[in-house]
């Protein structure tokens, strides 16, 4: 397991949802693919209590391949009440997306949501496509259209990752997260730590072992730092 370069200190806010930090965090969750299943549970609880209001799950296209996302979509489709799933489709994932779902997302983008094959409709959701998800006015119009629906709906928004910041548009993975950097150049600021970090040490060890034994496989919890280092290990 290769560690991340970004370590959270005890005095800082945690990277994910944490109920002990905020009354608005209902669950302790991990990295990805959790939003739809959690939201479907919240929507069911709302209905059982006879309450009203919108329950909205936001998920990126990269997270849709997770098994928990499929389970959540499956359950949510049968709710029969207001349940909104927003798919932020920016065609970017740290590990490149592959599979039938992503072929269908591409078909939907290319036809502006009109493709005869529609994964979400097949599951029982209403479906609304937003051509430019970086256009705030288009988003407002779409959300107004779906907020009072009495059954599950998917809002599929096509977005550009890093929109408005040229460096982030061109280097999507580099700016997926970052330590402090210079806004003009993109160069990292601050003094780097002395010596090798955990990721460097682990990567170096794995490379040595792989040279001796081609059957060695490296497993990463999320991703292995910069793309060049990751390709060197994979």
What are these regions (language model features)?
Residues 132, 221-222:
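Structural motif
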Residues 17-22, 207, 229:
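Short, hydrophobic/aliphatic alpha-helical segments
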Residues 4-5, 9-17, 23:
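Active-site-proximal gating segment of KS-fold condensing enzymes and close homologs
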Residues 5, 19-20, 156-158, 220-221:
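Short coil/turn segments at secondary-structure boundaries
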Residues 201-214, 219-220:
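Accessory "access/gating" subregions that flank catalytic or transport cores
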